[in-house]
Amino acid sequence: MTAPYLGNPKRTIEVLQKYEFVFQKKFGQNFLIDTHVLDKIVNAAEITKEDFVLEIGPGIGTMTQYLASAAREVFAVEIDKALIPILEDTLQDYENVTILNEDILKVDIRKLAEERNGGKPIKVVANLPYYITTPIIMGLFEGEVPIDSITVMVQKEVADRMQVGPGTKDYGALSLAVQYYAEPYIVANVPPNCFMPRPKVGSAVIRLTRHEKPPVAVEDTKLMFCIIRASFNQRRKTLANGLKNSPELSFTKEEIQNVIAACGFPEGIRGEALTLEAFAALANAFVKLR
């Protein structure tokens, strides 16, 4: 297996110039040019020769080379067709890599895992475009894809939101959704100078290890997340007002007040004060009203 040779500014510039590549803002392209960060990502993902790895947004193949050297198979999905000939060049010596030119949100990942990995859990590794981080991660979790872990580069602010608890300014619907499905752990903070071009914000590598089973028992998961969204759509409103004003919910003011009281919460409590367990209790109480 060929050793990785990309991952530094000089080699990246050489490849980009060779193909006269122009960065596309609409794709949120920021390529990693720091080998230490690449090592941290691959090590955090705990890739072995048994693993099937889905890489989202391989760029010029920098991290793909690292992944291919460690995994059984890498399936790289790249939306920018201008990068496909570059990937075919930089990855030509890696026989265990498949490249697909497609929007990851249009890929049937569950079917992919079944066909390429026998339905066993896959590992997802990516330097994600920041503008589409949440739809990708939630799509993976909510789509019932068999996943072992997701190790990704994201905007630092988003990584912080994924792992915080109640009572903090970053706590919200994303925190609760991620923590329902996985155990989040920030591996490293990454400064802008580790990318080309440099992003205007700080970044972080976060690993999301899928729970074998959710940490709370919920009779209606969809309802729980409707309640969560309603609780944070207007953060400064009380929980009762947030639920009453939600277009996703149809409970009366009296029903809402009765459920909140039955769960033992103060009348003026806000959603930002509730734990995942508390939201599960709320959802289960509302289910009984049906």
Task: Go through each PLM region and give its residues.
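C-terminal lobe and adjacent flexible extensions of AdoMet/dcAdoMet transferase-like proteins
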Residues: 210, 229-290
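Catalytic cores of RNA-modifying enzymes
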Residues: 1-230, 261, 272, 281-288
